[in-house]
């Protein structure tokens, strides 16, 4: 049966857009901004350390930033109520 794998998104900044094809072997290319010269690449979390190390060694890569999606609070129920109580306590 299909098992869901934990994945993480990486924002990879490039020096030149022509080097985007070189990064397709590391994971799934989700988006390529030709104007801002960055890619969004999704890779498996268990391969993160090895693939990140290999990607940083490439001369075409300027910078790599991991996605902050896991750090964001996605519990939306009651967010407005929490904000109202925090504002009343401050003021």
UniProtKB/Swiss-Prot annotation:
Which HAMAP family does the protein's record reference?
Answer: UPF0298 (MF_01126)
* Assigned keywords, A-Z: Cytoplasm
Q: List locations, semicolon-separated.
A: Cytoplasm
**What domain of life does the native source organism fall in?**
Bacteria
> Which family is annotated?
Belongs to the UPF0298 family.
Which protein, by its recorded name, is this?
Answer: UPF0298 protein M28_Spy0318
Q: State the organism's lineage.
A: Bacteria, Bacillati, Bacillota, Bacilli, Lactobacillales
Q: Which InterPro entries match?
A: DUF2129
Asked if the record carries the keyword Cytoplasm, the reply is yes
- The answer to whether UniProt assigns keyword Repressor to this entry is no
Q: One Pfam match, by short name?
A: DUF2129
The Gene Ontology CC terms held by the record are: cytoplasm
């Amino acid at each position: 049966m299909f098992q869901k794998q934990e994945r993480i998104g990486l924002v990879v900044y490039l020096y030149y857009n022509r080097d985007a094809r070189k990064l397709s072997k590391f994971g799934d290319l989700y988006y390529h901004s030709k104007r801002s010269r960055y890619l969004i690449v999704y890779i498996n979390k268990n391969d993160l350390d090895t693939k990140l190390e290999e990607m940083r060694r490439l001369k075409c890569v300027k910078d790599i930033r991991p996605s902050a999606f896991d750090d964001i609070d996605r519990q939306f129920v009651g967010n407005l109520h929490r904000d109202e109580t925090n504002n009343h306590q401050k003021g």
